[in-house]
Amino acid sequence: RQRQMCIRDRCEPYLTSDYRLMLERPEDLIQGLHVVLSLFDNAKGVIAIEDNKPEAIAKLQYLTDSDPDIEVKVLKTKYPQGAERQVIYVTTGRKINSKMLPADAGCIVDNVQTVLAIYDAVCKTTPSMSRVVTLTGDAMAEPQNYKVKFGMSHAELLEEAGGLKENAKKLISGGPMMGMAMYDLNTPITKTSSSILAMSEDEVEKFEPTNCIR
């Protein structure tokens, strides 16, 4: 069975760090994918991008048009299209049950920043000491993407980014679907810190308490 290496674009709402990197470092991304493919015999690469990112799609399709080992696949924009099992099925047709790992189906799935970190380490001998973090939401003073060193606290990052607006109601580390509410801003940025989402009163869902019955 042919091995497949898939780069997935993040599908969480609000997060744009991987999208910006696809626009700004497409050649490095493709070279990083080739580094991974070189580790296996008869391996093919797939870059899976949702169809709401036409500029990134056009750039990567242009760069891989004559590349026999890499294919750009355009996926429908829906959540959780970028989840590991879903992206393997939609790009390869291979099904993975709850007891299987991607490797059992001959697949590896990584995100954009991981593949770029591989490129930096192998091709530029640069260690992985930072990542791009999305700061966004209606209550963020200056929403944009920041390259942040590991170990910097969330509080320090927010201060560097201009802080929060007065209407900030809730902070989430990560995206709105899989992220965690933040209660301590002194926690450090790590390799898994994808974003800080500052939500206003209008963005926070309110529920009226009801009786718990069947």
Summary of predicted features, one role per range:
Residues A43-H154, E160-K165, G175:
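Hydrophobic alpha-helical positions that pack around
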Residues I189-E205:
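Glycine-rich and small/hydrophobic secondary-structure elements
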Residues V133-L135, K165-S194:
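Ubiquitin-like/PB1-type beta-grasp interaction modules and other compact soluble beta-rich domains
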Residues K206-R214:
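Cysteine-centered iron-sulfur cluster-binding motifs in ferredoxin-type domains/subunits
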Residues R1, D18-R20, E27, N42:
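Conserved "landmark" site that anchors the functional core of diverse proteins
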Residues L23-L39:
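Histidine-anchored nucleotide/phosphate-binding helix
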Residues R8-D18, A139:
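Gly-rich Lys/Arg/Thr-decorated short loops/hinges at beta-loop-alpha junctions or inter-strand turns
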